[in-house]
Structures are given as structure tokens and as C-alpha cells.
Amino acid sequence: MINPSGLLTCLLIATGLLVGTHQNSEAKPKPKKLVKVWESDTTLRVPESVLFDHTTDIIYVANIEGKSDELDGSGFISQMSLDGKITNLRWATGLNAPKGMGLYRGKLYVTDVYRLVEINTATGQVEKTYDAIDQKNAFLNDVTVAKDGTVYVSDSRFDKIYRLKDGKWEVLISGEQLNKPNGVLADGKESILVGSTKTGALRRLDLATLKMTTIADGMAATDGIVTDGKSGYFVSDWNGQVFFVDKNGVKESLLDTRTGKINSADIEYVKSRKLILVPTFFKNTVVAYHVE
């Protein structure tokens, strides 16, 4: 004889399992996909970094034009529109090998081998420069600016992170624990994210303790780091990959152009358009992908 209460219990358990399974399947986010939208012309010259100004809809492009550490004065900054047109190829000139960029209140901060330069966005003229402590042993690479205007700069060859705060330019942290830092991203008031090229890791630097913790690894030559505007990050590998890293440190491959020998240097994300902008370095273009 079937026990009615036992049957009811079994049905409830089964229903609960089905509901739980359904909820778990819904909770798992769909994989992201990149769809190419446009590619600029090839008049750029070794574009290393791109930066979007949401107040003007201008895309800035740092062009090395030459070797990445050569002091030849041939580097320049271009301006582009959101549809991929180069509106001013040589907007700011006279740089050496410009790379990472950051914006704050009408000032564009750009690394230039051994120095950080401050450019007035209204004129395109360099107004201030900040030299590395040892100009012959410096390779300043990426820039990030916190909401309060504090500027952080990585030195990827000589394991340093500089800070420019209230006009004071200093080394914030140095040493092999940085593992050749490249990409940097201000992440709130208490920390910055650092891409350690030597280990292919995305790491968090606590600004109070200067201790580092690893968020995700296995991304080869980590270059650009940008937020998705929520709780995740897009990270580029200079060799030609782009990853998405969620808040739990789980990474997802979005782009791999290594077989075509197309690099992906210091990327940008335009949240309003869901566009990832990828400078292709030796291919002399910027490519825009829609995140779907």
C-alpha cells in the first residue's frame, strides 16, 4: 500500500530539486561574444593605447611610431570619432613613444618612456612633465586616474608604480613582487588593479597596506584593464587576446587574433555603446567590437 504522506514528501523533494536546477541554470550568465563593428584606416603609426572621453565623444590614440623606448620625438596622439574615423591624426606631437593615457578635468596624462606628460585637451599642448627617478632606467607604460584626480603610472621594465597626488610625484611601490606591471586601473578609493606581465595575472594592490592579491591569471602579457561598468573587467593580452574577468575571478576568452599576428594592446571600453576598442599595434589600426 502506498503511503500518501510519503508520496507527498517525494513529490515535494522532486519539485524542489527541479526548481533548484532551473534556478541554477538561470543564474549562470551567458558567454559574452565580440562582434566586429568597424576598423580604422591604417594611417595610425603603432597605436599602443586608446582612451575614450565620454564628455566629448572623442577617442584618443597614442601612436609610438618607431621603437617603444626610442627618444626620437616622432610619437603623437590622434583623435578619432566613435564611428572609427580619424578626425585629427596628429593632434598632439613631439612625443617619443607615447603609451598609456588617463583623463582628468581637461588634462590628458600620457606616459612617454621616461616621463609622464600632461596635455591640455583644449590646445593639444604639453603643459607639464614629470620625470622618472632614473631616466635611463625607466619604461613608463600605463596610466590610470582615480576619481579624486590621483594619477597612477606603471613602469613595466623596472617594477615600479608611481603616484601623482596633489602635485607630488613619487614612487608608490617598487620591487619584484610587481612582476613587471603593465596595465593599471583605479578601482575605488582603496585599491588599484595591476596587470602583471611576467605572470599573466590580474592583481589587486591595496593602497593602504601595499599588499597584492591575485584575482585571475593565465592571461600571458597582460596589457589593458578596463571595467565593464558593473563588477567585471576586460583584460587584454598584448599578443592578441581579450578576456573578461568576473567579480569571482573567473575568466572568459572573448578574442584571439594571435594566428593572424594581430596584437591587442591597451584597450578601452565604451559602456554607452558596449564597444571594446582594440589598438592593433603593428597593424596600425584600431578595431571596435560590440559586446554581445
What are these regions (language model features)?
Residues M80-G84, N120-Q125, L164-K168, D206-L210, ...:
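Short loop/turn segments that connect beta-strands within beta-propeller blades
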